[in-house]
Amino acid sequence: MVNTRDFLPKTTHYLKVPIIGLNAILWLLGLVLIVVGSVCISFFSNFKEFTKESGYKNALSNLTTSAPTGVLVIGIFFILLTLVGCFVAYKEKLVGLVLYTMLMLILLVVLIGIGGKALTLDKEDAVSIIGTSWVQISNSLKNSTITKLEDFLECCCWSESYSNQTYKDLCPKDDDGNIKYEDTYCEGIFTKQVSSKLVLVGIAGVVIGCIEFVAMALSLFLIIRICRSPRSRAYDQY
């Protein structure tokens, strides 16, 4: 029978140092998540009125509000959790390490889920929904919303198929009344913006998840080592 003691470091020092190091890296990556979430929220905040007027309000809300806010909240939670991880690892707090590891496991599942969803999301379907809503709102009394979005995205008309004079009348114009971004269609601009942000969120989620898994595994080894330590009964485990 294999003796698992042979696989563990002889002292907790060799586990504490990499755990603290990985948590420091994860803290920095938590900042990255906050920045990414903030950028996405800032970008999609311009679609608030568009989403409200759209016939696909629920679907668009998930893309423009729920997902970016979720990334931001996870980033904030991550920063707090990694600080706790550094403290309980350094002080060898057994109960603290157990709680930290459990929370890391939950966060790992959430991160991999978000990262995988972002990378595998059907971008064509999302763009199709936006396009349908774009045309719908362009032909409604709230078409000023489209002019604001086109000015923000620096484009004119959703696509070449919808570039007749009716749609061009909504395009942003300069002081002389000339169309600013003629022949620069919003479909291509939007697709590029959304794709880059989804890829960034997806890669960040997967990379952080992998590093987090290693930190969590080392924390489990540290818990086992503390429990097996001759001094474990004398420890301040709380």
Swiss-Prot record:
Glycans are attached at residues 62, 143, 164. InterPro entries: Tetraspanin/Peripherin (IPR018499). Residues 38-69, 115-197 are extracellular. Residues 1-16, 91-93, 219-238 are cytoplasmic. It is found in: Membrane. Pfam families: Tetraspanin (PF00335). GO terms for biological process: hypotonic response. The chain crosses the membrane at residues 17-37, 70-90, 94-114, 198-218. Keywords: Glycoprotein, Membrane, Transmembrane, Transmembrane helix. It is a multi-pass membrane protein. GO terms for cellular component: contractile vacuole; membrane. Belongs to the tetraspanin (TM4SF) family. This is Probable tetraspanin tspC. It comes from Dictyostelium discoideum.
